[in-house]
Amino acid sequence: MAEAGARRPFFRRRKTCPFTGPNAPKIDYKDSKLLMRYVSERGKIVPSRITAVSAKKQRELARAIKRSRFLGLLPYVIR
């Protein structure tokens, strides 16, 4: 039997990957507006545990951000 004052533990709902599904956006190094959502205010790539991006798509995203930086579409550091 459960105690009268015992609470149920809080379970955070697992977020779904924003790049999976039928009408999900395609990760492209030329789409700097989309890529900027996954870069912090200091210019670092935001980890997947915060953005809920799957491991496969996180690797794709990191590759696209790095390509975009190399071509000068995204800054390396934001001041």
From Swiss-Prot:
One of its GO terms (cellular component) is cytosolic small ribosomal subunit. GO terms for molecular function: small ribosomal subunit rRNA binding; structural constituent of ribosome. InterPro entries: Ribosomal_bS18 (IPR001648), Ribosomal_bS18_CS (IPR018275), Ribosomal_bS18_sf (IPR036870). The keyword Transmembrane helix does not apply. SUPFAM superfamilies: Ribosomal protein S18. GO terms for biological process: translation. Keywords: Ribonucleoprotein, Ribosomal protein, RNA-binding, rRNA-binding. The keyword Zinc does not apply. Binds as a heterodimer with protein bS6 to the central domain of the 16S rRNA, where it helps stabilize the platform of the 30S subunit. Belongs to the bacterial ribosomal protein bS18 family. Part of the 30S ribosomal subunit. Forms a tight heterodimer with protein bS6. This is Small ribosomal subunit protein bS18. It comes from Rhodopseudomonas palustris (strain BisB18). The gene is rpsR.
